């Protein structure tokens, strides 16, 4: 069979790198085929399950199957209908292979290797919603006969001989896996300090105050990958609710949502994150002495009283405006703003890690700024928010009650009342000059990059980054406290990926209101006479129904600012924001927006050459963009060491007449506005789901861009791919995939994760 080495194969040194680079690239999240999550030992031992996590049409909520939460042992997972992929029978090297679905999948690929050139044949289904076949050991022979090309890695190049042999040796040896990682010595001391703060306060805080603050922090950080000051860049932790006190082994309290009733005494504990880090769920939150001082300033030392603790009933717990009313709005808002990108990432990378339901309501590229927490603005005042808190309830309170379209009825009425309250509060305010109005915008203290963000959306995935990136966008948001908080509780804390159709539809429809609110705040900074025209241009068709929301028209017609000097106030506003935010807005974006040579960052001759060439690629626009991948990574080879090559991301920004329907596929002509599609190019790796790779030598970069800009139809694109693309069949595919992951780690040593290849195109 195989000659096994005398020493056990090292899981971390030999096996895990192969799993991460060849298997986790598809098996890393809720959308891992057959729920086979290969990011950790626990996921491998758990095995597979035929039920899909993502099922927007289900009428009843599914039982959650979250790794490290909903079951802790292999036996418990078997009770939840997970089937083994490793041998669980008689243990010997032959049985360990014969009885391993994982081995047989690998063997199937060796027996039926895929083509090494051209596109994959039509019998390969690489669509995201493809039917899944999840054979058990007893079903495998039938599966292999029906799907001879269904070996692993599916629809990707074969493993190398060395990779295959290493995995087979490991499986034959019984798939030995070391114990879980434990906290480092540097982290241990800090964990004790943080657990003391969360569970006991500062010594000067009441029990109620300590409990309320800890609950607030947990409900906002429960999905964070916590990183402690002074620890390794790749060492992360999780904040959990445990039934055991600090000093004892953690026993996670499993609830469907972080604000559900724990039904027992809660201790807030910090535990080591186990397994591989994948880009699509990696959200880093830094904990340090400085952060602790900030929390003490905002929450523990601030003067307020907590006379009673909020209920865990859904109508209270899902509405943070009500649940945490005792904590000053300023403290809550500043906490969110300090790491605004993290909280925006929450609905991009959180439970909705395949987020068509949530993300289909936002544009493909837009900018975000925030109201200043110290500005004299009514929606930021405690009294106003406390009086309107009932209007700020969201469908999260329904949990999985099947109240279809509640967001179009009950919650629409609440939104109308909130709008009317805002109008009444500001109706007597006169307009201010646009330059003075800039003082309403948070400037991040002149140093916090979270003050200006850009969001890119690509159908059902998205990314967010610091600064204003790309050309001036069609739309932008100005966010206040209640919008940011409600986004978190609707799509992160309150979103159940296992929920039913009603839950998912109502979340999506309510997010439409939140997007509108952020956009309308931006519009209020424009002249009233232009505002409605711009808004009508943004969205056509179905979106016009927004006018039916009582209060919106009046809000749109109120004059808030004056002093515009051009006929294009929207661009003028963007430029005002750029000047006001200064370096926090970015470097001017030489590739996409600023044509002045002064915007070109200092770089080597070849990098400048590549930048100038890629600048021309941003001229690609209109109908042809629909042919191109949403997110394409470009490797420009510099002729030296691989680590000296540079990476670009080419992003297709799709324009829409409407972003209001969750059921219409984005390609339907009544939604898409192909003529206004654009391209953005950045000199870094953006996004978690690359759709395609291009590789080009620096001396060929001008020809690369010329060929790219010459694409007019599908045939032109296929010819371009034949020259520069890395197809699923390409002999060097894995080499370049590895390079992009390594390059991401070089660019972002702490924030990087393994890219997901589930969406990689067959082109």
Predicted regions and their residues:
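Aromatic- and Gly/Pro-enriched helix-to-coil junctions and flexible linker segments
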Residues: 1-763
